[in-house]
Curated annotation (Swiss-Prot):
SMART domains: ZnF_C2H2. This is Zinc finger protein 134. It is found in: Nucleus. Keywords: DNA-binding, Isopeptide bond, Metal-binding, Nucleus, Repeat, Transcription, Transcription regulation, Ubl conjugation, Zinc, Zinc-finger. It holds the Pfam family zf-C2H2. May be involved in transcriptional regulation. Belongs to the krueppel C2H2-type zinc-finger protein family. GO terms for molecular function: DNA-binding transcription repressor activity, RNA polymerase II-specific; RNA polymerase II cis-regulatory region sequence-specific DNA binding; zinc ion binding. It comes from the Eukaryota. There is a cross-link at K20, K135, K139 (Glycyl lysine isopeptide (Lys-Gly) (interchain with G-Cter in SUMO2)).
């Protein structure tokens, strides 16, 4: 790639040569030429992290976002008329071109772009030069698009300040200001909708159940509970959802994406709610309190299970024999008596399994394969569940909580053993 200014041309890292061109000198502009469509990411403008509207993951910049979106099917290429770079989405092309319109528009005329020349003077490395100076911070930058990136940083700061003060934002005047909190809006209907946060007004009522909402979009989303409408379908497995965010979360099962990281132990999670629950291991929070005895719990499900002690309720009924249970996991364990079949046979030892995953994991006993390795200590395991269980040694996580007393354990077997203390006391 070659950059040309009034003073010279940049043809590679640290490569700067004088180019005599009257048009270039008079207009004091920058022209850009890219010799190949698939230009590398080095030296190209970088933006802040951007989310994929199709499946949810957050990418570090517009180029990584567009590369990721190319994995989705049925998308057409959009080409930048100035440099030839191709994008899967037109919106990404526009975002890419914005970088050049911060101060100087990107040239599109072919005759003007013809002044760009390749460096043929010498193949030897030249002393690194930094001909561009940032007016905001007096920092020097090499003759790369990094200067453009720096301008974008300051542009964002100015935009943020402009938004806070109620000035124009992207050409819109922020005429409508909230009298409660001072937040400004460009449209009156947006202000009216915002003010319902303060007033508590909920004008949109569900005709089926009477539940009210502050936004019409939320009512439409709620009504799908009654209509059974599930318009968002997973392209991988065909499962449908009533909400787009639920589909986005579900897709992480297929992609393996885990965008939420715990700052304490570095563990990753696919759902933000799972991260919040996990962080209670570190901060000791127990937000769920029993109204009968005052005991507190880390998980809402544990509180619900605990409350059955006071009510004597056994809400989980077996559809096969009618037996009822106080806990859902106890019902699931019981139902295996009625439903379990074992179609998967190991040809090595003749053992049968009800699930293919158990069969595959069992075969590793014979092959010696241990594909799941702990990144902390290097210990390897046959099953991913065994690795997850082992990692609690390093993280200190104790996800199994006693519904009687709130004591937590790292293994379900330890919780079961502990709960016998309570059941023995009631006999």
């Amino acid at each position: 790639m070659t950059l040309v200014t009034a003073g010279g041309a940049w043809t590679g890292p640290g490569c700067w040569h004088e180019v005599k061109d009257e048009e270039s000198s008079s207009e004091q502009s920058i022209s850009i030429a890219v010799s190949h469509v698939n230009t590398s990411k080095a030296g190209l403008p970088a933006q802040t992290a951007l989310p994929c509207d199709i499946c949810g993951p957050i990418l570090k910049d517009i180029l990584h976002l567009d590369e990721h979106q190319g994995t989705h099917h049925g998308l057409k290429l959009h080409t930048c008329g100035a440099c030839g770079r191709q994008f899967w989405f037109s919106a990404n092309l526009h975002q890419y071109q914005k970088c050049y319109s911060i101060e100087q528009p990107l040239r599109r005329d072919k005759s003007e772009a013809s002044i760009v020349k390749n460096c043929t003077v010498s193949k030897e490395p030249h002393p690194s030069e930094k001909p561009f100076t940032c007016k905001e911070e007096q920092k020097n930058f090499q003759a790369t698009l990094g200067g453009c990136q720096q301008k974008a940083i300051h542009s964002k700061r100015k935009t943020h300040r402009s938004t806070e003060s109620g000035d124009a934002f992207h050409g819109e005047q922020m005429h409508y200001k909230c009298s409660e909190c001072g937040k400004a809006f460009s449209r009156k209907d947006t202000l009216v909708q915002h003010q319902r946060i303060h007033s508590g007004e909920k004008p949109y009522e569900c005709s089926e159940c009477g539940k009210a909402f502050s936004r019409k979009a939320t009512l439409v989303q709620h009504q799908r509970i009654h209509t059974g409408e599930r318009p968002y379908e997973c392209s991988e497995c065909g499962k449908t959802f009533s909400r787009k965010d639920n589909l986005t979360q579900h897709k992480r099962i297929h992609t393996g994406e885990m965008p939420y990281k715990c700052n304490e132990c570095g563990k990753y999670f696919s759902h933000h709610s799972n991260l919040i629950v996990h962080q209670r291991v570190h901060n000791g929070a127990r937000p769920y309190k029993c109204s009968d005895c005052g005991k507190v719990f880390r998980h809402k499900s544990t509180l619900v299970q605990h409350e059955s002690i006071h009510t004597g309720e056994n809400p989980y009924d077996c559809s096969d024999c009618g037996k009822s249970f106080g806990h859902k996991y106890t019902l699931i364990k019981h139902q295996r008596i009625h439903t379990e079949s074992k179609p998967f046979e190991c040809i090595e030892c003749g053992k049968f399994f009800s699930r293919s995953s158990d069969y595959i994991a069992h075969q590793r006993v014979h092959t010696g394969e241990r594909p799941f390795v702990c990144s902390k200590c290097g210990k390897d395991f046959i099953r991913t569940s065994h690795l997850v269980r082992h990692q609690r040694v390093h993280t200190g996580e104790r996800p199994y909580e006693c519904s009687e007393c709130g004591k937590a354990y790292s293994l379900s077997s330890h919780l079961n053993r502990h709960q016998k203390v309570h059941t023995a006391g009631r006999l």
